[in-house]
Swiss-Prot record:
Belongs to the peptidase S10 family. Its EC number is 3.4.16.5. This is Carboxypeptidase Y homolog ARB_06361. Pfam families: Peptidase_S10. Involved in degradation of small peptides.
């Protein structure tokens, strides 16, 4: 059960006595306690801080891990970017060392190298492992709901701010993340703006990449056929199979919704029929977590390979649930060699660096450098993603209200907080068609959706536009043509420019 937060952080960070089993309030360590040693087998970087920090008001043993990197350029000293990975249950070190941090594993390298496209070039960057049990975040009692996740994170931020010279108040704070952080970011932003009297965070904007901002159906099945029609030849889908998928799509009414979403301005809200993936959520969650590997499909590993099986799987599956266009398509595609749901351009030469990341951060000398253990302590292996957290938070009973329904419109309309959505066109897991329909179904600042279509080009690479964009009434949307689910990894230079010019407005 969630424990109410009783702690009020003051500048001296003094505390009341603890109640048995709970850290109702604690004396906070000094900032110097988190200074890191130089990472083994890695280039030297500017001053940084890392470690675990207890969550006030929760069970003793529940803490979040953080890593704060200094700004590399004094011209951007006023900026603080907070990065959250998704999953749910995936470590922020995935983002830090595989995407946008000062050090990154490049290609087949087993040791981190300097990242020329580090976001620390644009300000201080704070990476947080959350919720408890994620990455290096410790867990005594696991979280069971998004409400608990957000409450813990907000309470933790209060402690972090007290230790680090009120950095959340004095810097321009931008919260950025990807995938399931599309849930985390709007909810924590909402908590921040509504509780400014408790912690006056100088929150300037939020940005979400390939994020789960809408209902599950809208994020996956609703846009799948629209996505497949763009890339049918690249994906080598036979005509009869494509027709069968389109049959299921039409039977569920998704094609009609997509057509309505193409009308600018929209003529009214869309009803999202069906509940994709409700029958066997754990199996589907595992499938998404592991990139649709055969062994992860379990009892749902039916591999529909004929038009008849495709149609049946979409409209009558006892495993995936009704209107499972996405799950059926992903199951079919999993039989193709070297297919990746995260970026359909990844081929057989693509190397997944997750095992390298886990091996490096499972080293005792690395964990000692990060203030996570003493030389005599037992080693705790590092896990990039925790499947138990994914299963818990993705369970139908635990899913929060999609941010596009209420939270995002409130942030934009009531609190006038700039919201930036960025998306990789090659991402099949959370496809851009579904994202665009979700935006067009959202009402903010007096109107529904974008009033004009997505047609402005941005960026140039080899005489071609990097993508298309639109911005209206405080919401911007950027579609990157050649990127997938992990955009900072796929297009590091282009995304760095995007963060500088769009998110930071510099």
């Amino acid at each position: 059960m969630h424990v109410a937060i009783l702690l009020a952080i003051i500048s001296l960070a003094r505390a009341a006595p603890s109640t048995k089993g709970y850290t109702v309030a604690t004396s906070l360590p000094g900032k110097s306690a988190f200074e890191t040693r130089r990472l083994p087998d890695a280039p030297e970087i500017l001053k940084n801080w890392a470690g675990r920090l207890d969550i006030p008001g929760t069970t003793i043993g529940n803490s979040l891990f953080f890593w704060l990197f200094s700004a590399e350029d004094k011209a951007y000293d006023d900026n603080l970017i907070i990065w959250l990975n998704g999953g749910p249950g995936c470590s922020s070190l995935v983002g830090a060392f595989l995407e946008n941090g000062p050090l990154r594993f490049m290609g087949n390298s087993t040791m981190p190298e300097r990242n020329p496209y580090s976001w620390a070039k644009l300000g201080h960057v704070l990476y947080i492992d959350q919720p408890v049990g994620t990455g290096f975040a410790s867990e005594k009692v696991p979280v069971t709901s998004n409400k608990e996740v957000i409450s813990n994170l907000y309470s933790w931020l209060m402690s972090f701010d007290a230790i680090f010279d009120h950095i959340l108040r004095t810097k321009k704070v931008h919260i950025v993340g990807e995938s399931y952080a599309g849930i985390y970011i709007p909810y924590i932003a909402s908590e921040i703006v509504k509780r400014k009297s408790e912690l006056p965070v100088n929150l300037v904007s939020i940005a979400i990449g390939d994020g789960t901002i809408g209902p599950n159906t809208g994020m996956s099945s609703l846009g799948m056929v629209g996505f497949l029609e763009e890339y049918a030849s690249k994906l080598r889908i036979p005509r009869d199979i494509m027709n069968a998928i389109s049959f299921g799509d039409h039977a569920c009414g998704f094609d009609i919704i997509r057509q309505r979403a193409k009308v600018y301005p929209p003529r009214g809200p869309f009803h999202l029929p069906g509940r994709s993936g409700s029958a066997n959520n754990t199996e589907i969650s595992n499938m998404l977590q592991k990139g649709v590997a055969d062994e992860s499909l379990g009892s749902c590993n039916i591999h529909p390979d004929t038009p008849e099986k495709i149609r049946s799987s979409i409209v009558n599956s006892t495993c995936y649930g009704h209107c499972a266009v996405f799950e059926t398509t992903a199951d079919y595609m999993s039989s193709q060699q070297c297919f990746s749901i995260y970026n359909i351009n990844y081929g057989c030469n693509f190397t997944n660096p997750t095992s390298t990341l886990e091996a490096y951060f499972s080293r005792s000398d690395v964990q000692i450098a990060l203030n996570l253990m003493h030389p005599t302590d037992p080693l705790r292996p590092f896990q990039s993603c925790n499947p138990k957290i994914l299963e818990t938070l993705m369970a139908p009973a635990n899913r929060p209200v999609p941010p596009s329904f209420e939270i995002l419109p409130d942030l934009l309309t009531t609190h006038k907080l700039p919201v930036h959505i960025y998306q990789g066109r090659l991402d099949m897991l959370i496809n851009h068609v579904g994202i665009e329909v979700t935006i067009q179904n959202m009402t903010w600042n007096g109107a529904q959706g974008f009033q004009d279509s997505l047609h402005f080009e941005f960026g140039r690479q080899k005489d071609k536009a990097v993508g298309l964009w639109n911005e209206e009434r405080g919401l911007s949307y950027h579609l990157f043509f050649e990127g997938g689910h992990f955009l900072p990894a796929d297009l590091p230079m282009e995304v760095l420019s995007y963060v500088k010019e769009v998110v930071l407005r510099q």
